[in-house]
């Protein structure tokens, strides 16, 4: 198993603002520079799916596997002989809202999918979270 996390603590946004932004999957392309298109297939609830088209990559179907409103959601992307999980965690602290994204890859071919997909996602996390904060402030 491979896991990488990135966190930022900020007083610029509330958990309600960041939750509204990040759970509005259909509009990710408006603030996430790595996303060409995204579409929620149904409702934002466990067991539902969304389609994601990263810039320069193929369209993928992603499943919502855990949701705790205003605290956390986790999605799962299935690859041949591997699964990738993206955990989006929001924690109120004395220093502000701590925003953490953790990417995890499991499976027999995880090393291949880490090189092909996960490393690029992790590299973009600092900029992605800054963009989330900037855009959530407008809500």
Protein language model features and the residues they cover:
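Generic recognition of short, well-ordered alpha-helical interface segments
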Residues: 13, 30, 59, 120, ...
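A short, structured loop/turn motif at beta-sheet edges
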Residues: 12-16, 65-70, 89-98
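N-proximal short alpha-helices
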Residues: 1-4, 37, 63, 98-102
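Residues at beta-strand starts and edge strands
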Residues: 2-4, 58, 71, 84, ...
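Glycine-rich portal/gate segments that line the openings of hydrophobic small-molecule binding cavities
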Residues: 10, 29-30, 39-81, 85, ...
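Beta-strand/loop substructures that line and gate deep hydrophobic ligand-binding cavities in soluble
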Residues: 78-127, 139
């Amino acid at each position: 198993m491979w896991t990488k996390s990135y966190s930022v603590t900020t007083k610029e946004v509330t958990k309600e603002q960041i939750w509204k932004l990040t759970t509005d999957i259909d509009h990710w392309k408006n603030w996430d520079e790595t996303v060409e298109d995204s579409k929620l297939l149904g409702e934002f609830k466990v067991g539902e799916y969304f389609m994601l088209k990263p810039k320069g990559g193929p369209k993928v179907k992603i499943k919502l596997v855990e949701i705790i409103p205003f605290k956390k959601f986790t999605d799962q992307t299935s690859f041949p002989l591997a699964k990738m999980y993206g955990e989006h965690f929001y924690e109120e602290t004395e220093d502000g809202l701590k925003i953490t994204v953790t990417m995890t890859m499991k499976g027999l071919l995880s090393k291949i999918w880490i090189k092909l997909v996960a490393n690029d996602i992790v590299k973009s996390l600092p900029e992605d979270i800054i963009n989330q904060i900037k855009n959530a402030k407008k809500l």
